[in-house]
């Protein structure tokens, strides 16, 4: 026994057992520049967060092309850094807004559309600042989550739209920027996009994103 103790060593080892998440997510992205512009003004992030959560965010910079791309890239990079540092999602968005408002003489706004998935409970937390509608496709229904708040970078005190929804296996969360909405007739965007989403049985997220983009552009 003494020889075995010498072989095994005398140092203590801590083993932590954690329950695995109940859910996992699959993502798909499709984007194109506005008009003849090859550069899209939209940017996105997908980030693993502490506590078995995943964050997905879109940002649409003011205007189009390279300038809009720089704006949305800045927003996404700041958001990612703040979330990785442990700031709550809503506070992180408000901090970015303050930075953009106070640090510039001219107004350069960007939208933020964010969803945080709890992989243990299946709850999706949605935060929007000037963003387009989000569509939640379930087995038999499609729900629209709309934003009434301003984009970030416009006013000092920003109200962030906030909602929570229970998600189930097989649900789709479809997030779009205003480039998709602007390509559809005014006043009919949500209805037409819902029709496009409802009219397909695609289950692959990447194929779904490409299908929506193709249908809207056609």
Regions picked out by a protein language model, each given a short descriptive name:
Residues 50-51, 105, 116, 163:
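Non-catalytic regulatory/linker segments of enzymes
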Residues 32-34, 51, 62-63, 119, ...:
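Short, glycine-/Ser/Thr-/acidic-enriched flexible segments
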Residues 8-61, 67, 74, 133, ...:
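N-terminal entry segment of metal-dependent catalytic domains or homologous docking segments
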Residues 37-50, 145-185:
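Acidic loop->beta-strand submotif enriched in PP2C/PPM serine/threonine phosphatases
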Residues 63-85, 167, 171-217:
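Active-site-proximal, acidic helix/loop segment immediately C-terminal to a metal-coordinating Asp/Glu
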Residues 2, 6-12, 69-139, 213-218:
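Catalytic core of PPM/PP2C metal-dependent serine/threonine phosphatase domains
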Residues 54-57, 126, 173-176:
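Short hydrophobic-aromatic micro-motifs
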Residues 125-154, 161-163, 190, 194, ...:
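PP2C/PPM-type serine/threonine phosphatase catalytic core
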């Amino acid at each position: 026994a003494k020889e075995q103790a010498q072989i095994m060593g005398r140092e203590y080892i801590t083993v932590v057992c954690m329950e695995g998440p109940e859910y996992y997510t699959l993502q798909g992205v499709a984007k194109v520049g506005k008009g003849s512009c090859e550069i899209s003004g939209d940017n996105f992030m997908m980030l693993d967060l502490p506590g078995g959560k995943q964050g997905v965010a879109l940002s649409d910079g003011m205007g189009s092309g390279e300038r809009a791309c720089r704006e949305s890239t800045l927003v996404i990079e700041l958001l990612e850094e703040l979330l990785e540092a442990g700031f709550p999602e809503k506070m992180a968005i408000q901090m970015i807004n303050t930075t953009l408002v106070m640090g510039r003489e001219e107004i350069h706004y960007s939208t933020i559309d964010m969803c945080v998935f709890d992989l243990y409970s299946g709850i999706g937390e949605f935060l929007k600042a000037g963003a387009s509608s989000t569509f939640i496709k379930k087995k038999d229904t499609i729900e629209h989550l709309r934003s009434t708040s301003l984009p970030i970078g416009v006013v000092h005190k920003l109200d962030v739209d906030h909602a929570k929804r229970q998600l189930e296996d097989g649900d789709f969360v479809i997030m779009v920027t205003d480039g998709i909405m602007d390509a559809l007739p005014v006043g009919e965007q949500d209805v037409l996009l819902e029709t496009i989403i409802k009219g397909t049985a695609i289950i692959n997220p990447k194929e779904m994103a490409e299908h929506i983009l193709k249908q809207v552009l056609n």
